[in-house]
Structure formats: structure tokens, C-alpha cells
Amino acid sequence: DDLMVMLYGMERFDVDGDPGKLKRLADHLDVDGIDGIDDSDGDRRIASVQGLKEAYGFAASRFIVEQAEHFVADHDKELLICLLCPTATEQVLRGQPRYDQGFANYLRAAGHRVFDMNEVHRQDFGDFSLSVEDYRKRYWMGHYSPAGNHFFAHSLKDTVIDWLEPKPRTYRGDAPSSADFDGYLPTPV
């Protein structure tokens, strides 16, 4: 009954789906062009399934972000959203449009603090004369390698520092002095 599992199975393993349920999902998500889901044209069917799967996934992601917004508001917290998707990274490295651009735009338009590692990789890739495959070998081994983890952490550092208040002592720009904990510890009553 899980529609995402159904869509994934249709896309990856050519299983039959339930066109009626998927049509209702498409109507709910206001997705056009899913007529090919029950079509005998394999390419059209896959394109329809992928389009609906992505729309459903991003709708679920927007819902999760909305729930996180409520949580942080209720608990006087702040939210930082980090974007890193191997598919989107591959697309930006190849100069192609990102499949998740609409979601990235949604996050920014909603005023969220967003760290987009896909764009960091795009900028970094521009500093090299490497093929996409050779660039990916620097940071990935099926998932991030230790070098990839280090690159991510180092790239995220300034975003976190800009977010923190008070800033960590080493990033305050003050002259070296003894460490203090102003702003970090509660003030005695």
C-alpha cells in the first residue's frame, strides 16, 4: 500500500502498479502527464513514474520541513537545512539542471537557513581540470570517503560559525585573551 514503494518498484523492477491509486496521488499533488503510467511505451511509463515519484518525494520533504518548523518554533530553536544529493551533485558537475531545484528554491523562498553542498561541489569542481568521474574519486567511494567527510565539514564550518551567537572564542576576532564563557553559561541569579 506504500505508494513510494510502488513507484520505486515500477521504476527499478518494472513491476505493475495500481494506476487508479497513482492517478489519485497525481491529482492530489497536481502533477500532469502521468497518463503514461499504464502505457505500453516503456520510456513514457518510466518518465511518468519518475515524475510522480519525485513530486511525491518533494511533497513529503516539504511536509517534513513544515513539521520541523513547528518543532523549532515550539522549542525556541533554529533550523539549518543541509542539501547534498548525489544525483543533484552529478547534475551540477555536468552543467545540467538540478532535479531538486524547485525544492531548493522553496527552502530559500521560505527563509530557511540552507547550506547547499551541491553548489559547494560545483564551485570546487570549477577549480580543477578533471573529468566528473575523476573529481568524484576525490571525495566518494560509493559514499563520502574520509576526504569527502572532511571537505563537507570544512565547507559547513563558516555557515555554522555565522549562525552561532555568541561566536566561539577563536572566531570572535578579539585579541587573544583568557578564555571566558560569556553567553555560554547561565548567569547566576
Describe the function of each predicted region.
Residues 1-112, 117-128, 168-189:
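Serine-dependent acyl-ester chemistry module
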Residues 136-175:
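Histidine-centered active-site loop/cap adjacent to the catalytic His
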Residues 49, 129-139:
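Short glycine/proline- and charge-enriched loop/turn segments
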